[in-house]
């Protein structure tokens, strides 16, 4: 994977490319919706757009229960539901950047949210509560005894030692 320095110009270029790609009209392709939602989540300031993209999927007539999804009339696939689940998880918890980002997306629809025992890369189990768009608390358990950098949008970054509960009220 190439690791380019992210600049405002690069973000703008990526956003313009993504907007062009999604401008071709509605689609019933769930994987395109999942990919668009995840890509929008990676661009600063596009929280609402990412949530809007993700919500397009829930009304698809070809999205069934569990992992049933049909790209066409007779072709069941399972990638799209898993992609949509990943996009939803990215809204709550991201750990693919080398940090653990808790509630990286802030959208009005998730004004009050919580999750318990979600897995993060590096052998971490994370639980957290968001109330009125403010992070109330985060609990991290390191299954391997590792340390991590916790990033919470409305807190200053916190270095976390194994088995520590981080709480900030205010």
Question: Positions of the model-derived regions?
Answer:
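Acidic-and-aromatic substrate-binding clefts and catalytic sites of carbohydrate-active enzymes
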Residues: 75, 106-108
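Beta-rich accessory regions
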Residues: 5-28, 43-49, 108-170
């Amino acid at each position: 994977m190439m690791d380019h320095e992210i600049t405002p110009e690069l973000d703008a270029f990526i956003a313009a490319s993504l907007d062009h790609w999604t401008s071709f009209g509605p689609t019933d392709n769930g994987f395109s919706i999942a990919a668009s939602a995840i890509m929008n989540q990676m661009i600063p300031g596009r929280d609402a757009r990412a949530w809007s993209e993700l919500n397009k999927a829930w009304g698809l007539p070809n999205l069934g229960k569990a992992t049933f999804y049909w790209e066409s009339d007779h072709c069941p696939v399972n990638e799209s539901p898993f992609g949509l689940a990943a996009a939803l998880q990215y809204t709550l918890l991201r750990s693919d950047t080398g940090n653990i980002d808790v509630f990286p997306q802030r959208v009005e629809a998730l004004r009050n949210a919580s999750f318990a025992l979600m897995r993060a890369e590096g052998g971490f189990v994370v639980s957290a509560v968001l109330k009125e768009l403010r992070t109330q608390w985060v609990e991290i358990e390191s299954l391997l005894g590792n340390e991590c950098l916790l990033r919470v949008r409305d807190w200053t970054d916190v270095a976390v030692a194994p088995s520590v509960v981080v709480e900030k009220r205010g």
